[in-house]
Amino acid sequence: MILKLVHCLVALTGLIFAKPYQQQQAVLAPSQDVPLRDIHIGDINFIHTTDTHGWLGSHLSQNDYDADWGDFVAFVDILREKILRQSRDVIVIDTGDKRDGNGLSDATWPPGLRSSEIFNMMDYDLLTLGNHELYTAESAILEYRGTSQSSKFKDKYVCSNVEFIEDDGTRVPFGNKYITFETPIMKQRVLALSFLFSFQRANNRAIVTPPLEEITQKSWFQNMVETNREEEIDLIIVFGHLPATDPTEREMHKIHALIRKYYPNTVIQYFGGHTHIRDFVQLDSKSTCLQSGRFAETVGFLSINMTDPVDAESPIFSRRYIDFNKEAFKYHLSKLGHDSNVPVSTKKGKTISRLVNDLRHELNLNEKLGYIPQTYYVSTRPLNSEENLYHLITHKILPNLIPPKNYEPSMSRFILINTGSVRYDLYKGPFTKDTEYIVMPFNNDWRFITVPLVVASRVETYLNKGPVIASLGIPSSSHHKQHFGGFQKCPFINNPNLSEGYTTEDDFGCHGDDTPHNSQREYDIPNVVQCKEVKKVQEEEADPSKMVHVIFYSFMELDILNAVNSIINDLGLRMENLTTNDCSHYGGDSTKKLLRDYFSQF
């Protein structure tokens, strides 16, 4: 008797070499008995956000991130006032990616239509865009006209290497190429630039020039250095949507090397983003880069003491990653003011919180679609663990993809998805409309191609050895901090009095997080995972030449074809190279819909 074996596999990459570098999520609320680490006020102080992706309404299933945008605005306003009273300067910065990842931004068209208005109620001093502001023409138009050219931010929005295309085809700078200003208290003369990484998937209303090309080939940069000589500038701020640590492209380091040619002795402070991690890099004795996480989990704080009487030639940098919760905000405000009863809310903050809540209800984001009986993790559980989200998808979700009516039922199939289509952990509790936007916001179309089993069985391995498959999902883990020699500088924390949370290692050591947490191990995420259905008791019993279906997301088509043709050639099979003409529409529900249907049973 021929039996159908549903054998759903995930790539085992990273199961052996787990690393406690960047844990993804906190699980429990921090104990009030756990002492937090203070922020240190300098001559110039920075508050930094990045990669918020629409998370303006707090993390409803995670108490460690229970502050909403109104709480954050109130915190910044009060903190700014307290620092200014100490005769020190404050600069508030955001480095882009404000949509794609939460219902508050994504349940409207275009994404960010309503959330941008709330986001912009923060009084940023400097801001720019990320790649998620450029995936569609509608998003680019909204960002350019609603934020970049708004009366509030027109003189504060900087984007040195992106151009916007007007309705008549005219190319104009997306924001200021650079700006100069003087800080109000310390009277520091500041030059600010901003760069987006070499992003090649912009829509037809925007053009991105690679940063190094922009610097070396455009006349504005040379004009800038000629009119802003080193002796006239006290501080350079380079903020943008590119990683602090990037062992492959090293764009930040290359930008720094070029700017250093013109400003060899000036303090240069960088602010990065894109790879969704907490990070701090020292570029030289007068330059560092801060990257402040993602998804309104982190408030980055940095101070520079530029007038140290002992050694004026060596500025003192101090960084802190603040957990995005109300208790942490209250702690830092009370310590700064030496007052445990310091107010932590403002009229403006309460208004913003109400707007966030009203928008959540208007978009029906709390609509319950099912129940999640346990928590599933993206990368802090091994891929073969029943607590891993990809394990759930490949074992419980993808097998429910119903083939079309004309599909041959005896045909074996391999269903592949790119891991970047999953954006976040799935937490125990109600499965709501918002949950869909948070975990798997994108719909997909299924395509398939017919190939011999011997080829299909090698596609997953081939893709997981190749470059990252482009998507709107989590950026490549290849940008995560590299630890040479295979050892960590920081200990793995396992304290029964602590909750799980971020335990960050950076160039300044192991104590940058304001809230001590237990570490979580981080497992590498492969490019793709697959569900394999082979119509034999054992796969090895199947005829390797038997034709099977490889099913995949439509945007993966070129990657699949490249893999299939390379495998065919490597095996020396007598087959013509396959093309898009050999791929067909498969049909069936999207993974997003399959996920919803699965949890609707609970």
Swiss-Prot record:
One of its GO terms (cellular component) is cytosol. Keywords: Glycoprotein, Vacuole. GO terms for biological process: NAD catabolic process. It holds the Pfam family NadN_nucleosid_C. The keyword Cell membrane does not apply. InterPro entries: 5'-Nucleotdase_C_sf, 5_nucleotidase/apyrase, Metallo-depent_PP-like, Nucleosidase_C, Pesterase_C1039, YHR202W_N. The keyword Glycoprotein applies. N-glycosylated. It is found in: Vacuole. Glycans are attached at residues 305, 497, 577. GO terms for molecular function: 5'-nucleotidase activity. This is Uncharacterized protein YHR202W. It comes from Saccharomyces cerevisiae (strain ATCC 204508 / S288c). The lineage of its organism: Eukaryota, Fungi, Dikarya, Ascomycota, Saccharomycotina.
